[in-house]
Amino acid sequence: MIETDKLAAERIIAATPASSHEEAFERALRPRQLDEYVGQEKVRDQLEIFIEAAKRRSEALDHVLLFGPPGLGKTTLAHIIAREMGVNLRQTSGPVLERAGDLAALLTNLEANDVLFIDEIHRLSPVVEEILYPALEDYQIDIMIGEGPAARSVKLDLQPFTLVGATTRAGMLTNPLRDRFGIVARLEFYDAEQLSRIVRRSAALLNAQIDPAGALEIAKRSRGTPRIANRLLRRVRDYAEVKADGNITAAVADAALAMLDVDPVGFDLMDRKLLEAILHKFDGGPVGVDNLAAAIGEERDTIEDVLEPYLIQQGFLQRTPRGRVATLLTYRHFGLSAPDAANPVRNLWDTPDAEC
């Protein structure tokens, strides 16, 4: 899994941050207020109402759970919530909170109505999660003083606070934890027009010249994800400054992204390698994932966790009981004629393949 995570971070079209340097770059481009936040209109409108209501009552905002694919702005929203509420934000992540004392130290240092942001909240340990329940409901925590027979439990009162939890895997949250969030919001992938607005805004902050067509060209290849759009913008800006006059046009963006092996739908070399293997080595499928992994020289986990999700979400790949199958979109993308088998229909005699 470590190798899979490393590989995901190395891809230019990966939705996870590649380095601490990139995280610092993201912070510089991050919108600071809700009215600067592009996209996610439904979530933004809801938060605007809930935040204003909490401010009028001088209360802490209800606890917020943000979930959705990586790179869509969950961390950005957590910072915006704190800024709109006019309070401090403390940030941590699930894997960092190893012991109950780690969480207790954070909670006891919060001031009234502060925001505690826990990224990857689905990775909290059960021990830490147990401490969190009374803190969320009653603004109290139980801590143990002493050891052995002399140990005793002491209740500590906390200041009212808002927990903002972020996760890419909402299904891994326990029911008791999920039920304690009063505001639950799912972030969706962005369309090309929304991403184009984000690219133009980021270009202005970077003092980069870009025209609307150039911004749209980058947006269309960003896989619906602002983090990828901003990363591609940086690379296209470099290309424009060295190979062109510094102005990012559609032609300049196309040439730069072609150099980076990012095609018109946002596929990179690894995406195309997987799809071409299914088309040419396995006649469009079905093919079991272990055979596919051997054919392209990648690990099974890499295929399932890194490569497949976007291809399936975009309709280029199907998972069937018998294996992976290329769709009509895949044949069209590679300029091939699709056989009838490219639009499979399951019948009663289909049986699951053990390696699927």
Swiss-Prot record:
Residue numbers binding ATP: L29, R30, G71, K74, T75, T76, E137, D138, Y139, R180, Y190, R227
GO BP annotation list: DNA recombination; DNA repair
Region (Head domain (RuvB-H)): 264-356
Entries under PANTHER family matching the protein: HOLLIDAY JUNCTION BRANCH MIGRATION COMPLEX SUBUNIT RUVB, PTHR42848
Free-text comment on this protein's domains from its UniProt entry: Has 3 domains, the large (RuvB-L) and small ATPase (RuvB-S) domains and the C-terminal head (RuvB-H) domain. The head domain binds DNA, while the ATPase domains jointly bind ATP, ADP or are empty depending on the state of the subunit in the translocation cycle. During a single DNA translocation step the structure of each domain remains the same, but their relative positions change.
Function description: The RuvA-RuvB-RuvC complex processes Holliday junction (HJ) DNA during genetic recombination and DNA repair, while the RuvA-RuvB complex plays an important role in the rescue of blocked DNA replication forks via replication fork reversal (RFR). RuvA specifically binds to HJ cruciform DNA, conferring on it an open structure. The RuvB hexamer acts as an ATP-dependent pump, pulling dsDNA into and through the RuvAB complex. RuvB forms 2 homohexamers on either side of HJ DNA bound by 1 or 2 RuvA tetramers; 4 subunits per hexamer contact DNA at a time.
Protein name (record): Holliday junction branch migration complex subunit RuvB
Gene: ruvB
